[in-house]
Design a protein with these regions (language model features):
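Class I SAM-dependent methyltransferase Rossmann-like catalytic core
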Residues: 4-42
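Conserved class I S-adenosyl-L-methionine
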Residues: 43-53
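Glycine-rich SAM-binding Motif I of class I
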Residues: 55-59
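Conserved SAM-binding motif I beta-strand of class I
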Residues: 70-75
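S-adenosyl-L-methionine
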Residues: 80-110
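A short glycine-rich, Lys/Arg-flanked "PGG" loop and its adjoining helix->strand segment in the class I
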Residues: 133-145
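Conserved beta-strand signature within the Rossmann-like core of class I S-adenosyl-L-methionine
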Residues: 143-153
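Core SAM-dependent methyltransferase catalytic element
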Residues: 174-188
């Protein structure tokens, strides 16, 4: 079985087993381009990825960030976490088997300050309201003043919630993903 087939099957099995996995297949490169294609990472010091899954975006982000930037991955699914720890061996990366709500605690322990960008693949539609709010509040309070929170979803169900937490929310859409996806680019 090829790596692509293994990744697809692993993702499908995790989707069937765990409600917290939001899609049957990994996200497409087209969706990644909508999320981070226009971002200048040259001055970024800390970038965070919530719910990287099997790392569909992670390697592209790593290729774009500068040599002194830290990329922090928050992945609660143990199978995906283990795959990330075995496939990513970059000294700029911190991989955590923790909930995104713990971002502030980690930044404090590591004495890292605020974050430039947060990319989120967390399926907000599947998360209880209180947890959703907590994740977004923690994202807002840990972003730099010019930082961005970029979230993709398969519906507009949480658009109002994002507008409550962020002063500016821009919306993009791509059909070139399965399923097609909305990308929210949010500023504090």
């Amino acid at each position: 079985m090829t790596n692509i087939s293994q990744t697809f099957m692993s993702h499908l099995l995790e989707f069937l087993k765990h409600r917290s996995v939001g899609t049957v297949v990994p996200s497409s490169a087209f969706l990644g381009k909508k999320m981070y294609g226009n971002i200048d990472f040259s001055k970024a010091e800390v970038v965070v990825e919530f719910g990287p899954g099997c790392g569909a975006f992670t390697k592209d982000i790593l290729a774009k960030i500068n040599p002194n930037c830290t990329l922090i991955l928050f992945e609660t699914n143990t199978v995906f976490y283990n795959k990330l720890t075995t496939s990513i061996k970059d000294k700029r990366v911190i991989i955590l088997n923790k909930n995104a709500e713990q971002i502030g605690d980690l930044l404090a322990v590591k004495n890292m300050g605020k974050v430039d960008y947060i990319f989120s693949s967390i399926p907000l539609a599947l998360i209880p309201k209180g947890v959703k709010r907590s994740i977004l509040q923690n994202a807002v309070s840990n972003l730099k003043p010019n930082g961005k929170y970029i979230q993709f979803q398969y519906s507009l169900a949480d658009y109002k919630l994002l507008k409550k937490h962020f002063s500016r929310v821009r919306l993009k859409f791509t059909m070139l993903n399965f399923p097609p996806a909305f990308v929210y680019s949010c500023s504090v």
